[in-house]
Amino acid sequence: MAYGGPSMNPPALSGAVPGSANLKQVKLERESELRIEVSEEPLRLRVVNGTAEIFGSELPPEIWRTFPPRMKFAVFTWYGATIEMDGVTETDYTADETPMVSYINVHAILDARRRFAKASTSNDPESSQGPRVIVVGPTDSGKSTLTKMLLSWAAKQGWRPTFVDLDVGQGSITIPGSIAAAPIEMPLDPVEGFPLDMALVYYYGHASPNMNVELYKALVKELAQVLEKQFVGNPESRAAGMVINTMGWIEGIGYELLLHAIDTFNASVVLVLGQEKLFSRLKDVLRSKSNVDVVKLHKSGGVVARVKEVRKRSRNFKIQEYFYGLSKELSPYANTSSFSDLQVFRIGGGPQAPKSALPAGSTSVSNPLRVTPVNIDDRDLLHSVLAVSYAEEPDQIISSNVSGFVYVTEVNVQKKKITYLAPSPGTLPSKLLVAGSLAWLESV
């Protein structure tokens, strides 16, 4: 383990390496980190000696890793290391004040609770349940980074925790607009991120929960119920518990949705990053729940604030990554189907009840959970990202997860044909597609 014992490797001198203008070595002292923002060009990096990790995953010695443009990360060492970089960064600097000791202490406590749960009898649902950790905090407080660390440290010790991502604005497991869960069987790759092959994905279709709050809550509840059923038949996963990432909207409805998530997933540990006010509110409102610990943690000084335009750009890159790969190494397949071969639906809108059925003076309100068919010849579908639902009937769409996504590149009304990109060739797993407000202008 990177934090399991002192390094026996001798330190190296820092500074530029002769013979290359873009080759640079940095010596890190114990419990310090190298914070990096990659420029518009990829960056190569390796550990020359010592041990170091990124997002809780230890880097192999002497092996170059390539990091994509615009990626932001920190290389941390517990006992000292020398890092070598090849390329130009937007910025890079060392820092010796980090919250990592407090983070690893949280991991140690969670590990003890997992061991207790594993040793307990499976007949006792409460004691056999491992920690269900939910990470909350404002925008750009380091929530995603902390969840990666906790998951990687747990996997390094042989656990198989479940990662749950409720942040529809960015999306860690798959494209934005989704909520998802995935078992983490090994420390996360610092470049590739979360595995998608075993992910359970529900499509919300929007980048913010305020577009349809009731739908967001319904999908969160559906995901929680499915995971609960899986835990019943898998005591090891149950003992490993969950780590849940949340959105950065913590005021008004956003705060209500945080409480809804804490309650729906039966969270036992609430980690609050970067805001005293939120910690105080949650501590007070959860005071009556003796089985819930609310813990305040400092955010890292390396967290980078992102403006609205940067967030939008990040969403577009995530969609591009889904179809083309992180380094554009994939080639999606263009498929053309007749309008009659597919059915597209939106969730929300439509009258909930006719006026004649309402009390005098009342007005009809829209039903946020109504599944409404969409005309495929609607030009609004052009450049849309559509989810391929596992539902067999339209009324099962909300309760069904999705198999993947397609991107609409052309709608030919005259020929009644729709052309879309898909990650794999052949017929789609289902003819039922789900649309939201998520769109993407391809620039590859």
Swiss-Prot record:
It is found in: Nucleus. Keywords: ATP-binding, mRNA processing, Nucleotide-binding, Nucleus. Interacts with PCFS4 and SYM5. Forms a complex with cleavage and polyadenylation specificity factor (CPSF) subunits CPSF30, CPSF100, PCFS1, PCFS4, PCFS5, CPSF160 and FY. Belongs to the Clp1 family. Clp1 subfamily. Pfam families: Clp1 (PF06807), CLP1_N (PF16573), CLP1_P (PF16575). InterPro entries: Clp1, Clp1/Grc3, Clp1_C, Clp1_C_sf, Clp1_N, Clp1_N_sf, CLP1_P, P-loop_NTPase. Required for endonucleolytic cleavage during polyadenylation-dependent pre-mRNA 3'-end formation. Functions in gametophyte, embryo and postembryotic development. GO terms for biological process: flower development; mRNA 3'-end processing; mRNA processing; phyllome development; vegetative to reproductive phase transition of meristem. One of its GO terms (cellular component) is mRNA cleavage factor complex. It comes from the Eukaryota. SUPFAM superfamilies: P-loop containing nucleoside triphosphate hydrolases. ATP binds at E33, K72, D140, S141, G142, K143, S144, T145. GO terms for molecular function: ATP binding; polynucleotide 5'-hydroxyl-kinase activity. This is Protein CLP1 homolog. It comes from Arabidopsis thaliana (Mouse-ear cress).
